[in-house]
């Protein structure tokens, strides 16, 4: 299914050192090799044991390589965390374990400026669609998902 305005809640448990993510508004097709080329990513990570992603805007609950969360109420690897993503008319909220940790607007000047300074600068269609699939990332690390629920917002 394709989603534009929605609320997603998912429980996940990360392995030690693990790295994964949840992408939304993903466009798939022959023009794209990977979902991350078009879909903004809510980062899932073991912050303590994944030193390659130590920058704040690459930590758990960040919009990967764009915005750091305001706080980090995550539970360490091996424990269940609850993620929430809410998208309504380009306004996006990231939730972690019941706490609102990040807000941004997909069309704001700040967002567009950050994109130019990020790894997404060369991906012309990244975060452009406004509608698309929701994708759970396989980054090669063990991560478990349960209680995945999506609700459309009218």
Predicted segment positions?
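Carbohydrate-interacting regions of secretory-pathway proteins
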Residues: 1-154
């Amino acid at each position: 299914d394709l989603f534009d305005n929605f609320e997603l809640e998912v429980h996940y448990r990360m392995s030690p050192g693990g790295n994964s993510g949840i992408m939304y508004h993903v466009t798939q097709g022959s023009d794209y090799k990977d979902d991350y080329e078009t879909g903004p990513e809510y980062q899932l990570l073991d912050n303590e044991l994944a030193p390659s992603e130590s920058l704040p805007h690459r930590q758990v609950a960040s919009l990967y390589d764009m915005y750091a969360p305001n706080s980090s109420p995550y539970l360490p690897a091996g424990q269940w965390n609850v993620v929430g993503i809410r998208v309504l008319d380009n306004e996006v909220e990231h939730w972690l374990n019941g706490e609102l940790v990040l807000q941004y607007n997909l069309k704001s000047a700040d967002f567009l400026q950050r994109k130019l300074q990020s790894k997404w600068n060369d991906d012309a269609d990244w975060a452009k669609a406004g509608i698309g699939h929701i994708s759970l990332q396989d980054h090669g690390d063990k991560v478990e998902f349960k209680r995945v629920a999506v609700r459309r917002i009218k």
